[in-house]
């Protein structure tokens, strides 16, 4: 197998395995009422100040309309709270409830463990090389996504 085939196989397997492992790790009995996509919306909202819908939609790469559907479900399930901006009542702000903050931390801990496991045993040069390669991959996806939108 040449380098191209190896990289292609690794990328496909990694993508599928990360999605599978993330789903099994995140959707525990406590969080069985939400999906991995819901967890990503929760992550995008974050635990700081409330965010407007456009900001969250951009962070998860969906339209505001698509996000509205997800937010409606998360509000009903008690993970997200929706309010109006005091400055501009037309602006809808979303923030995490206590239940949502717990889910956020659960997701954050999973990612911390995943990253630490990947970096464990790598020397500084290997860590730098991996970081550089992953940034190039991210740049490809960012530019590919931007071409698709135009």
Which sequence ranges carry the predicted segments?
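N-terminal leader segment of winged-helix/HTH proteins
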Residues: 1-32
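Terminal interaction helix/tail motif
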Residues: 3-5, 109-150
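N-terminal positioning helix adjacent to the helix-turn-helix/winged-helix DNA-binding module
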Residues: 7-10, 37, 99, 126
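N-terminal helix-turn-helix DNA-binding core of bacterial DNA-binding proteins
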Residues: 24-63
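Short, locally clustered residues in the helix-turn-helix/winged-helix DNA-binding domain
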Residues: 43-47, 108, 135
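Helix-turn-helix DNA-binding motif, specifically the short coil turn and the N-cap/start of the second
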Residues: 63-66, 70
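Charged, amphipathic alpha-helical coiled-coil/dimerization segments
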Residues: 72-129
């Amino acid at each position: 197998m040449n380098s191209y085939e190896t990289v292609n196989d690794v990328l496909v397997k990694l993508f599928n395995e990360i999605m599978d492992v993330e789903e099994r790790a995140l959707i525990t009995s406590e969080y069985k009422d939400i999906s991995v996509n819901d967890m990503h919306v929760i992550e995008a909202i974050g635990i700081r100040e409330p965010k407007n819908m456009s900001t969250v939609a951009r962070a998860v790469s969906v339209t505001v309309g698509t996000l509205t559907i997800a937010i409606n479900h998360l509000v009903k399930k008690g993970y997200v709270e929706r309010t109006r901006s005091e400055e501009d009542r037309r602006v809808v702000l979303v923030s995490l409830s206590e239940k949502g903050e717990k889910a956020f931390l659960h997701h954050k801990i999973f990612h911390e463990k995943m990253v630490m496991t990947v970096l464990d045993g790598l020397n500084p040069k290997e860590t730098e090389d991996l970081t550089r390669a992953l940034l190039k991959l991210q740049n490809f996806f960012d530019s590919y996504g931007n071409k698709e939108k135009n």
